[in-house]
Each structure stands twice: as C-alpha cells, then as structure tokens.
Amino acid sequence: MKKLFIVLLVALVGFASTSCDDFLNVNENKDAPDKVDAYLYLAGLESAWQGLYYDLRATAPLSQMMGTGSYTSYAANFYSKGSDAAGETWRIAYWLHGMNLENMVNQAKADEAWTLAGIGLAIKAYTWDIMCKLQVELPMKQAFEVGRLSHDYDYQDEIYPQIRAWAEEAIELLSKEDNFAYGTKLKENDRVFQGDADQWIKFAHGVIVNNLASLTNKKNFVSEYANQLLQHGKLALASANDNALMSTVGGAADAQFSIYNNFWGVYRGNLSNSYWQSDYIVQIMTGTVPVYDETTGDKVRTSKSDSRATYYPYELNPKQIIADTLVELAGHFDPRVAAKLSTSDDITYEDIDDADSVKMRRYYGSSFTGASGPIGTAPNVFGRFAVSNKAYDGTGRWIFRDDAPYVLMTSAQIKFCMAEAYFKMGDKANALATWKDAIKDDMDFTVSQLLPGKAKDGADYGALPGGDKISKALFNQLAAEYLAGPFVGQITESELTLSHIMMQKYVALWPWGANEAWTDLRKYHYDIKYSGDYPTLDNGWTLTTVDQKWDTDESKVYKGFYLAPAQVQNRRGTYNVENYGSPCYRIRPRYNSEYMWNLNSLGALKPIAGDALNYQCSIPWFAYPDGYPM
C-alpha cells in the first residue's frame, strides 16, 4: 500500500508539473503575452505625453496666457473640487508611465540596450520635473513599492536632485555603445527623435536646465546652481533643429483613432470656443500695455483720435518690452503675433504676403473667464467667434493643427534659462548675446510650424479653409527687421533687464509651455509687493486684494501683469474665501488617487497640510529664497 501511494504521488507530481508547464506556455502566447520586448513600451510611453496638454487647460489660465470658459476655477486661482481636473500629469507619471516605464528601463538594462534605457530615464526625468513643479510634494521613494496601500510624501527639495540624477544617468547610458541590435525597431517606435541618442542626450541636459532654472530666485542660486545650469545648457538643444517635438498622425475624421489628431487641432475641438488668447499676451505682443493711474488704479483714457486710438482707447506705457504700435517703422512689429495669436481680420487670406496689411491687423484678448476682454472680444484660436469647424478652419493653423506636433522643449526655452542665469551672475555680455540667440531661435521655431492659408479669390469663405494669416517669406522678412530693431538688436548690455529676458521667454513659451511660464511667475511671486523673504497674509495680500508692484517699479519683472484681485482696472475681482487672499501656488494632487486613497499621508504635509482648505496656496520650495519655513 505504501509503495502504491508513493507511485501515485510521483505520478501526480509529474502530471502537475507537466500541466503547470503547459499552463505557463499560455504566457508566451504571441497574441496575448505577459511580457513584451522593451522597445514596444516606447511609443505608448511617449504618446502619454499628449496628456501634458490636458493640464495646460489649467496652467494656461493660471499663468494668464489664456482665458477660459471651461476651467474657470483655475482661471480664478482656485481648483475644481472632487475632480481629477488638472491631474493628468499625475496620472501619466504614476499610471500611464508607472511600472510600464520602470519595466522598459529595467529590461533594456538587462539587454544592454543602453540607448533605450537612457531614453526611458530621460522620459522619467522630464515628466517628473513637470509634475514636481505642478503638484510640488510627491510620493517618490515609495511610489512603486509593491503591496503598499498608502505612500508617504517626499518634499520638493529631495525630489529635485533625484530628477537631475535620473537625467544624469540617462546621459551616461545614452553615451554607451549598445550591445543590442535594434534594427529599425527603435527608430520606428520613437516619435520624438527617432532613436537618435545624441538628440536624447541634448534633451536630458535640457531637463536639468529647466529643473535648475526654477531656482534662480533662491539666495544660493549663483553659488550653488548657476554654473551647473550653464554647463548643461551648453550641451542641450542648440538650435531650432534640435527642438523636442512629438509627432502626430493627424487625418481628422479619417484617422484610425481620434487621439491620432493633436489635442489642440480642429477635429478634436478641445480649444473650440472656450479658450482664448488673454488680454495680457495681446498687450505685450502688440505693445499695448496701458498706463495705470497709481492713485486710482484706472487706465488713462487717450486724448488721441487717430485710427489706432479707436482700436486701443487708453494711454500706453511709454516703455513697452516686446513691441510697440509704431508699426510703420521697421523693427517695431513682432511677426510672431501674426503666427501665435488669432485675429478675425483678413478672413479671405488675401493679404498674408502684404506687410502693411499684416501690421495693421487688430488683436483682442479675453478676460479670465470669458471671451469679452477690456477692449473687445477675443476670437477662438482659429480667428472666428464660434466652435471650431473643418468647413471653416480646415485642419487648423500653427501648432493648433490636427497634425501639429506636441511641443516638449525648444532651444529658445533653454537659452532664455541660460540668459537669466548669466544675468543673475552679473555677466551682462553673455546674457545679452544668449537672449538675442533665444529670440532668433523662437522665430525659427515659430515659422517652422506655419501653414499659410490660401486666398479665397472671391470664392465662398469655406472653399479653401484654414491656415495661418502670414506667409513664411513675409514672416522671415519681418523677423529679420525685428531682430535688428529697437526691441532686440539695438538693446545694449546696460539696457538689458530681467523683464526683457523673462517676458520674451513668456512669449516663446506661449501657450505650449504654460507649465514653465507659471513656474517662472511663481518663483518671482507674481510681482507681488511684500517685505521680507516671501509674501503672506497682510504682507502682499489681504483677504480681498493683492498688492502688486506698479509697472514703474524697476524691480517688477512682468510689466503689465496683474492678478485678478489687484488694485487696477479690469483686475478688481476676489479669490475664493478658502484662499485667504493668496494666489494659487500649486495644483492639488489627483483627486481619485490621493484624496480618496492616500489622505492620511497628504494630511501630514507641512507647512500647509494637503487636506487644508488653502493647500493650493502653499508656496513651493523652489519659490522660497531659503528652505521651507517649517
């Protein structure tokens, strides 16, 4: 009996192991694998980056790049309660990338596919840098620990160095010779640089530059960070040819999937008629920043009666930074306004190659939450006062096309960061030269995305729809004049100010770089007037009003910029009472992740707890001149 039992047991074990082997073979099914080659992760990881544009719906209004009738709570420096709005970057980092990205990097390292591993780490550093500037404190050390039901938060001063470390490791791996044969697989799955390791190295250096650039207002920036920024800047994107652009397929309704079209294009209709160019971007790009009476805060009505006065009925600040209204003089007109901003003028595209006509167009900006602005009504990004429609707008224009690439990083952006660093170090010569190069690079980027419209020749409006209202030839002509003119080429070392650098950077980032623009505004505390190291209640704002620097204050960085409850005309609103008078300094963590499942960890944060009513007003570490005031 004992022998029979042993025989049966051996037989059962043999049967069990055979069955198990057969079962496990299912996991090697080519149609339903549980493990894929590392390179197959890449296209999906990059594609997730389109979600960064989703969160621009919040940060573009927060940075006053756009007004919105949709994300109005963010336009009002608040947040959407009980909602995942503005939480897509969080979702990308922790879920869409998450373990997929970790697996790709680890598998690539095991395969000695160093280029792919380096790309993965560059992707991680870039995404986390953006997320850390938006949500500030994050679960990092425990983020991907298996089995955890809650995750402790790490502070920004710990996360920032780790982001740079990931980028440094990416550079190291990308510089190694692969011991893996990709064939065409890497090129075909990389929508940004088509597997070009040298370009990814520049990109990773750029991530470090952007990370360090948010620290320029810290007391130790020059001694601790400036030289690092410049070192990496010299190795980052060098020209518009290096720009990090993620391709899209386009195709409108003919595309296999809707998301193959750009999020901002005509077909997907996400900008439609609910997002508009702000009055601030229109003012600085058209040279119409007004004069405010510092006693009353009101704009000063002009006594002039010419045609320009009927367009802009207020006295203008005599010291415009970007451009002015003297368009008949060479170099006073910035042609980027004709590409980046929209106008309802010239709907037949007859004059896109006529300099005088292009210069005389009128541009209108929105209020914070509506198309109607202080001097007129802003059109949508396609130049009309209605929802986007292929019959009228075609495939779109500029970077608002169905097939437009997603803009991740530009050489202009990097050079503005370097110019700011040089300026902070007192090296005005290099600051000036780098600043001029940055503006030229943004001109090159801007014209590269133009899709000039075609004249209608008397046909119905919709016969040849869409496109940009300036030709490439005219843009280049006017760009050359502008670069040689009084706002760029004729600026001297002694005349260069921080306003020149940061406001030109703001224009270059419009609107794809709203996340970085909002970071810059926060690190300079929105040009709020305060004493000491940082603003607080009754030292920069009251419960009802923000006290901002006047444009005549030489220390004011963003001339013409005023928050909603400021002391000037068209800005006399109020914030939600839960802000206690403060502007917004951060995006709250994704609701369905943290407020539903990780609230205890969130509530432990200091100096303002993550479950506090005014957590969105907690100042980030990068904006404190020293450390956190714990």
Predicted regions and their residues:
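Positively charged n-region of N-terminal signal peptides that target proteins for export
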Residues: 1-4
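Hydrophobic helical h-region of N-terminal Sec-dependent signal peptides
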Residues: 6-14
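Membrane-proximal, proline-rich intrinsically disordered regions
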Residues: 20-73, 327, 337, 348-353, ...
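Structured, solvent-exposed acidic/aromatic patches
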Residues: 69-450, 491-496, 504, 628-630
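C-terminal/domain-terminus segments
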Residues: 230, 234-235, 242-244, 356-357, ...
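C-terminal structural cap/anchor segments
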Residues: 428-533
